[in-house]
Amino acid sequence: MFVPRQLNVRKIKAFTGKENNSIADGNNNKLKDEHYKHNEASKEPSHSISGGLMLNQQDRQLIEPLNPDFLSAVDSILEIYFHRERQKEKVHLAFLIQQDDFWKGIRPNPTQNNLKYALSYVTNALFHFDNSSHMVIRNENIVLPLDIPLYDRIIYVEPVPATLSNKSLLLAGKLRKYLKEFLPYVDAIGTPEGYAFVILYKKVDQSALSKLPVPPGWVLLTRKEWTNREEKYFENQLHLVKASSSDVSNSSNSFPENRYPKLTKVEKQMTKSVSKTSQTDKDEDNLDFTKNLLTRIKNLHPLTNKSTIHSLLSYVFSRQTQNIACEPMYIDYRKDETEAIIRWKTPLHAETCINAFRTQERKQNSHDDIRAHRKKGSSRPFLIAELITGEEEKNYWRMLKK
């Protein structure tokens, strides 16, 4: 159907039979009927108008109720705003709309109309909305002294999907109906690592959190419980490191021959050239270790992991030489760090690793990048491999022996 661009079909009144003086011929009568159909269609609760014209966001709000997540997010955003800005007595809707960090991931996008609509449904003891001035005003009779330690009011959250962790206020809105007995919110802190922190006004314990009917897959932990689990994790990691160290020192006696292939002729010849610097060293603490097995890889992506580092090393080795296989005995890496310590099977492997990164000049551009190609415009620094020697090397092995 053809509709002239000059006509705004939303503003045209329905035709009644009394307006015949504006319709002069049969063509105009036909246009009148089409306009009437459009006007009738606009009354239906649909996202589109018959004929292909789409309703804009403002018109849609007059037809459909807002998403409950949007209402909860608006309520949570204002609670957190008034806690962050203790000196502010009121805030205009236009100011809230301009704060992009508030609305990350929240749909629909905020407008004055849908915020007014949302605030007409929100009831909160902390603030109220003045429709005439478009101001959200802090209630004068509400005083929130935070006399409970932060340690008892903070919650560690692992959401599903994990990408919600970087959209803290949307996450707070989704949790609102489950945490209502501990509200209001004081703050919400997001991270890109798959977890976030929510700070509440009231004290919360793990037994209460465990009983909440949160969505499947979500993890809610108190600060105390999260700290305990983190300590257990590090203890387990240290145990694995020590076990791996023991395996390295006893590999010649305890490992089956087929676990690690024998050195090729090329490897044996190259090993002879570095054998003088790879002899067993003993210090005053009776520390026994093989020198020149440790290399440090620097400038890794902070969100990478051991599996990705192993794949990256294998790829770099394959580009450096076909005669030496990539055989790291252990990758010592902690989450969020940009460095890793690699323990190799022989000093030859460590030397090959250092030479490979020196000549290939690679950059790890993302957490799962196993090729580390130099992309145009990338601001990431080059990956660097260096040999760990001297007192640092002794301290590393000494720590594993404890």
Curated annotation (Swiss-Prot):
Renumbered residue ranges of the record's region xRRM-like region: 288-400
Described function: RNA-binding protein required for assembly of the holoenzyme telomerase ribonucleoprotein (RNP) complex. Specifically binds telomerase RNA ter1 and promotes assembly of ter1 with catalytic subunit trt1. Telomerase is a ribonucleoprotein enzyme essential that copies new telomeric repeats onto chromosome ends and functions to maintain cell division.
Domain xRRM per the UniProt entry, residue ranges: 288-402
Phenotype of gene-disrupted mutants: Critically short telomeres caused by reduced ter1 RNA stability and telomerase holoenzyme complex assembly defects.
PROSITE patterns: XRRM (PS51939)
One of the record's GO cellular component terms: nucleus
Lineage, broadest ranks: Eukaryota, Fungi, Dikarya, Ascomycota, Taphrinomycotina
Secretion signal span: none
Organism per entry: Schizosaccharomyces pombe (strain 972 / ATCC 24843)
Stated family: Belongs to the LARP7 family.
Subcellular location, record wording: Chromosome, Telomere; Nucleus; Cytoplasm
Recorded name of the encoding gene: pof8
Highest taxon in the source lineage: Eukaryota
Protein name in the entry: La-related protein 7 homolog
Gene Ontology MF annotations: chromatin binding; telomerase RNA binding
